[in-house]
């Protein structure tokens, strides 16, 4: 079997992209494959021994995706390449990760790319991957994002490696509802001053063009291609594992999910499928735009006994100046309104509305930053204590 290596935290969550890729390789290209999630605290000697034994009688092709910037995984790929493996890098950021930053050759402080670790890079969804692509060193294959994606997932193909290989029982999955983010369609120009500790050195401000949020890889990698057909979303949900007669919790991948949530819950119920929990990763402005509808939505969720977890809301900062630097498209007043809405609704939907850290949420907050002067820190702290 081909091994597809990824980063993994060790928690019982699936990895949609990598697991869908392994499923595609097996079901469409007849290349048996599994995903091996490597935990941060692992035994390198044991891993190399496992890889050597696994590939003893088969073609030495190893794939990598979702590496989360881990240098130890880059080095693993480099070592395998030196040992005669064909190493393949896949995923939404494969192009930039493989090539490096623009003008990196003349600017040594820029990211130089991962050509020394990988023979082949495949950018984008797996649909257009062909067996020949795995045989041409130096190739960068780019697959466009469209709504016609391969979305079959064998949720049982994920294993973990720490000291040895062990199968992971996935208890949290992902379901794709939209490709990219509508905010990514918006171009912005951010005027950035020099970092706080360099302000007295005569360094001028600089302008940076951004698509969507200035730090967001989704904006550059995917842009926005709209919602998937509902039938394709339902097929993904129907394919999820079950626990105690209900589908396991899943993240609904959609930066603006609230518009779809009510109709989706109703459609799933009509198909005789019982849900347990839906996790949302969304923007502040989506919550504010639908604040008057959330009560009815949560009543519907409560009727079907489905918990709604706002797992990650992109606050990023509680200072207006920083929000403008990040091209967030929101203000501190917007954030306060969002939080007040959730606090008010929590009084009614105690068990079915979840958004606190002790309920599993982990909201976006970027700090420290190079611009954290006294004025900004005071504004952030004042907002936090509201």
Give the ranges of each region predicted by the language model.
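Flexible, low-complexity linker/hinge segments
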Residues: 155-170
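Canonical Radical SAM [4Fe-4S] cluster-binding loop centered on the CxxxCxxC motif
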Residues: 166-230
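Catalytic cores of alpha/beta
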Residues: 370-385
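Residue-level recognition of beta-strand->loop/alpha-helix junctions
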Residues: 29, 35-40, 217-220, 365-367
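Alpha-helix termini
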Residues: 29, 50-57, 104-113, 186-189, ...
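Conserved SAM/AdoMet-binding glycine-rich loop
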Residues: 1-6, 88, 226, 230-372
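A short, flexible N-terminal coil/short beta segment enriched in small residues
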Residues: 1-29
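Glycine-rich beta-alpha loop elements in corrinoid/cobalamin-binding modules
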Residues: 32-147
């Amino acid at each position: 079997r081909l091994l597809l290596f990824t980063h993994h935290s060790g928690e019982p969550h699936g990895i949609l992209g990598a697991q869908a890729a392994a499923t595609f390789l097996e079901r469409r290209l007849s290349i048996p494959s599994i995903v091996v999630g490597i935990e941060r605290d692992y035994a390198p000697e044991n891993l190399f021994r496992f890889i050597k034994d696994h590939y003893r009688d088969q073609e030495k092709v190893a794939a990598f995706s979702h590496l989360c910037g881990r240098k130890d995984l880059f080095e693993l790929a480099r070592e395998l390449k030196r040992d005669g493996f064909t190493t393949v890098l896949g995923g939404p950021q494969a192009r930039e990760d493989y090539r490096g930053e623009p003008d990196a050759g003349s600017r040594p402080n820029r990211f130089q790319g991962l050509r020394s670790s990988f023979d082949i890079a495949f950018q984008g969804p797996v649909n257009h991957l062909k067996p020949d692509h795995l045989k041409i060193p130096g190739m960068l294959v780019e697959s466009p994002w469209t709504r016609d994606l391969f979305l079959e997932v064998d949720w049982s193909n994920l294993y973990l490696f720490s000291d040895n290989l062990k199968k992971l029982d996935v208890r949290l999955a992902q379901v794709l509802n939209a490709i990219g983010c509508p905010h990514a369609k918006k171009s912005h120009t951010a005027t950035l001053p020099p970092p706080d500790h360099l302000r007295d050195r005569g360094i001028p401000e600089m302008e940076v063009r951004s698509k969507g949020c200035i730090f967001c890889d989704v904006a550059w990698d995917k842009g926005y291609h709209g919602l998937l057909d509902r039938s394709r979303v339902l097929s993904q949900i129907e394919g999820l594992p079950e626990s105690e007669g209900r589908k396991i919790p899943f993240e609904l991948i959609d930066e603006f999910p609230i518009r779809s949530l009510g109709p989706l819950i109703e459609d799933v119920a009509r198909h005789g499928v019982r849900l347990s929990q839906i996790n949302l990763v969304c923007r502040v402005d989506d919550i504010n735009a639908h604040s008057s509808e959330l009560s009815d939505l949560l009543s519907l969720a409560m009727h079907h006994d489905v918990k709604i977890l706002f797992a990650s809301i992109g606050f990023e900062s509680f200072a207006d100046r920083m929000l403008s630097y990040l091209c967030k498209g929101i203000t501190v007043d917007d954030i306060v309104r969002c939080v007040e809405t959730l606090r008010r609704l929590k009084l009614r939907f105690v068990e079915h509305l979840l958004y606190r850290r002790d309920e599993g949420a982990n909201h976006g907050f970027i700090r420290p930053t190079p611009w954290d002067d006294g004025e900004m820190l005071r504004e952030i702290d004042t907002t936090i204590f509201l």
